[in-house]
Every structure is written in structure tokens, then in C-alpha cells.
């Protein structure tokens, strides 16, 4: 009986440890490097899904994530905060309709994400993106992103380097 209790406690500690490790990796400043979408117009300059990420916070046990990003409207950058709530492995949020998204850590400096956006007219757009702590991706990181783009059924020519048009404030207070 004592062995079972020790085993259960060990498994619980390992589970908490992995959540804390994930939280430590996700929390912090991030910048959008590339975006790709099934409908190019949705990520063109001035479009609502062209997101210039700045910060992600992982809530308790990472069951919620707080996404902070800018959208450009003309020459002005407007800051948004969107809360994703996790159900199983997928986060759900409200922004330009409903969004179902997933996050994937490549390493401590690279985070891939993909989502489905269903707007008010029930049109669905598939989006893939890569966030980074730096300004460049190495060859392996770019390959991993392009594999995600392909898995999402997004055409390679629909990939845009977002970093080049990002002139929104670099720091925010989440």
C-alpha cells in the first residue's frame, strides 16, 4: 500500500513538474516571425489575423494562456489580449469569431502555433505561425515550420515574413 502511495505521489510531482517546465518555457516575450494562411487576404497588412505577438502568459497549470499581440489599423498599432482556455490539448478563444489553436514548443526560443478561425459568416481560415525570442530561424526551425504549413494544407506561397513589417511597440506590460 505504501508503495502505491509513493508511486502516486511521484507521478503527481512529475506531472506538476512538467506543467511548470512548460509554463517556464511559454511565459515571456515572443515575436511573430512568419505567418501562413489558407486565405492570404486574412494575413495581409491591415488584416485582422496578421498578428504581431508580444507576450504569452501561461495561467494556472497552463489550462489558460493569455496572448498579447498587436494588429495594425492603418499606421496605428492596437494591442489585444486574448484568453485561450484549454480543453484536452486544444485551446479555444474568441477573436474575430471563434478560434481553436494549438501551441508546440520547438525549443526554448521557438514556438509554433496553428489555429482554425471561424468568422461570423462561418468561413474557416487555417493559420500557422512561428513565434521566436530572436529575429531569425535556423534551417531546422524553418523546416519544422514549413512542415507544419504543409500539414495544415496551406500553400507554400501563402507564407509571409511578418517580422519585416512589424513596427509596433516592442515592449508591453501584460
UniProtKB/Swiss-Prot annotation:
Keyword Disulfide bond among record annotations: yes
Position of the signal peptide: 1-18
GO cellular component: extracellular region
Gene3D superfamilies per record: 2.40.128.20
Keywords attached to this entry: Disulfide bond, Secreted, Signal
CDD domains: lipocalin_OBP-like
Gene: Pbsn
Location(s) in or outside the cell: Secreted
Protein name (database record): Probasin
Organism: Mus musculus (Mouse)
Domain of life where this protein originates: Eukaryota
Record InterPro entries: Calycin (IPR012674), Lipocalin (IPR002345), Lipocln_cytosolic_FA-bd_dom (IPR000566), OBP-like (IPR002448)
SS bond list: 77-168
Amino acid at each position: 500500500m505504501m508503495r502505491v502511495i509513493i508511486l502516486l505521489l511521484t507521478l503527481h510531482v512529475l506531472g506538476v513538474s512538467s506543467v511548470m517546465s512548460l509554463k517556464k518555457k511559454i511565459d515571456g516575450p515572443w515575436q511573430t516571425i512568419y505567418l501562413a494562411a489558407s486565405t492570404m487576404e486574412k494575413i495581409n497588412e491591415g488584416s485582422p489575423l496578421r498578428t504581431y505577438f508580444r507576450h504569452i502568459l501561461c495561467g494556472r497549470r497552463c489550462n489558460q494562456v493569455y496572448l498579447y499581440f498587436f494588429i495594425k489599423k492603418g499606421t496605428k498599432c492596437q494591442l489585444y489580449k486574448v484568453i485561450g482556455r484549454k480543453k484536452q490539448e486544444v485551446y479555444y478563444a474568441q477573436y474575430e469569431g471563434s478560434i481553436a489553436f494549438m501551441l508546440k514548443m520547438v525549443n526554448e526560443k521557438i514556438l509554433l502555433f496553428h489555429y482554425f478561425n471561424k468568422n461570423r459568416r462561418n468561413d474557416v481560415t487555417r493559420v500557422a505561425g512561428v513565434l521566436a525570442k530572436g529575429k531569425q530561424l535556423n534551417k531546422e526551425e524553418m523546416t519544422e515550420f514549413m512542415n507544419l504549413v504543409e500539414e495544415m494544407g496551406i500553400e507554400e506561397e501563402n507564407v509571409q515574413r511578418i517580422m519585416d513589417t512589424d513596427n509596433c511597440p516592442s515592449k508591453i506590460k501584460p
